[in-house]
Amino acid sequence: MLAALFEPIRIVFAFFESLVVTIGFLFVGGGQFVAPGDYLTQLNRTGIFDNRAQDAIPQTQVHDIVLEFFEGDHGGRSPKCLLIGYDGARADALINTKDDPNAGTQLLKADGGAIYNMYTGGSPRFINRQDTSTAPGWMTMVTGKWANEKDGTGHGVNNNDPSKPADGPKVIFTELLEKQLARKTHYIVSWNKHFNGENATYVNDIKYCADNNLAAAWTDTDSDKETFGLTLAEVMDPDGADMVMCILEYCDSAGHGNTFSNTEPKYVQAIKDSERDAAALIAAVKARENYENEDWLIIITADHGGVFTGHGPQFAGCRQIFLAANKKVLGGVLESTLPPIVD
């Protein structure tokens, strides 16, 4: 009842925020603000993406892609997934690595996959709005829901402050384990707000998995170096988790500390560092002793972009992100890249 009463207020607020954004595009210079249409055109001209920026896929589809993959036919192979997150990586950040064949995203494309324009922040903006921030972005990916959904099934994490309610939609890790599609899952992060504290984003998911004896591991570290190392060890372990997700903070840290811009050397280096770590993880997957008998879905994506030294509003530079995968997944339809099994 209260939600229904406050809904018109939220829509009006979102409208005025959008108006402020538009005014900012018109009056603020310096290259950080670009009119939405111009920014999308710039993304299209990069030659990086397999879909138009105007046709960006919603962030919600990541969950559906992963679930569909595990539920699909793997030709007798064991399904496994590695999801690598670049926190705070704008879509146009990939300009800095598009000519590097050893960059993580380029390796996935070379394996028969693709790189897609994707968006965060809710759709449509006035109805399903959520901050273009860390907690809402990743939560949308692992639940397949925006924070606010008309039917009341949203995950409720509008910004970085709240926990997902205990009665909210289940995260992909829980779903895979309960459906017996995965034996073990492991979620590894460098930002402790995900898992630590009374208001941790996933506190109720962690409790649910523990109460129900589900083999879900949740690990936070003190640095991206440690997150990378733990993820590498998990991927190299013959008995490691079937679903592994890690989040690297290089880009977000560089953006907040300097600026979210390709003219900022530290931000450029951050995307290169992310791509380097991703490439090493991809190599580790392919080096697994049982790799030929496994079917791996590997995804690299981001939770949000940024402008100046922040994010959260509905700026195009904050909303437009990307999804790279070793399989073509546009529209949530997986195209297998598996070679036939040779006896």
How should each PLM-predicted stretch be described?
Residues 1-36:
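Membrane- and interface-active hydrophobic/amphipathic segments that mediate membrane binding, fusion
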Residues 37-78, 90-180:
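Active-site nucleophile/metal-coordination loop of metallo-enzymes that catalyze phosphate/sulfate
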Residues 77-82, 111-116, 179-186, 238-246, ...:
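Loop/turn elements at helix/coil->beta-strand transitions in domains of secreted/extracellular proteins
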Residues 81-83, 91, 101-109, 273-315, ...:
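Metal-dependent active-site segment of extracytoplasmic phospho-/sulfohydrolases and closely related
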Residues 87-92, 122-126, 131-133, 146-148, ...:
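Solvent-exposed loop/turn segments at secondary-structure junctions
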Residues 136-144, 313-343:
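Substrate-binding rim/cap in mid-to-C-terminal beta-strand-loop elements of soluble/periplasmic
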Residues 148-220:
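Catalytic-site neighborhoods of secreted/periplasmic enzymes
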Residues 195-206, 232-280:
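Active-site His/acidic residue clusters
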